[in-house]
């Protein structure tokens, strides 16, 4: 469960290392973001000499949360960190690689490009 002011790791090679959530995008006024939700975030830490810089406002999709994800078949998935992938306005990832395991549910939210870049899909 990601809420505003939550710090997240970045799971791609876009140039950002750490993000802070400032808004959750969705119908109504969602209080928490879960896996597959799009957020507006600010870059808190970035790699030098990369296109993304510190204090830049970007969009990202949540790919891992410490809060467990329950599937319909009874399986519960829990990750060790909160992580996101930086995306553009069309929903395509800005990086060319994705690090770490990615849940299968992202395919249902039309983030197939992120799923195809991932080394492991749970």
UniProtKB/Swiss-Prot annotation:
Part of the 50S ribosomal subunit. The keyword rRNA-binding applies. SUPFAM superfamilies: Ribosomal protein L14. PROSITE patterns: RIBOSOMAL_L14 (PS00049). It comes from the Eukaryota. InterPro entries: Ribosomal_uL14 (IPR000218), Ribosomal_uL14_bac-type (IPR005745), Ribosomal_uL14_CS (IPR019972), Ribosomal_uL14_sf (IPR036853). Belongs to the universal ribosomal protein uL14 family. NCBIfam families: rplN_bact (TIGR01067). It is found in: Plastid, Chloroplast. Pfam families: Ribosomal_L14. The keyword Cell division does not apply. This is Large ribosomal subunit protein uL14c. GO terms for cellular component: chloroplast; cytosolic large ribosomal subunit. GO terms for molecular function: large ribosomal subunit rRNA binding; structural constituent of ribosome. Binds to 23S rRNA. One of its GO terms (biological process) is translation. Keywords: Chloroplast, Plastid, Ribonucleoprotein, Ribosomal protein, RNA-binding, rRNA-binding.
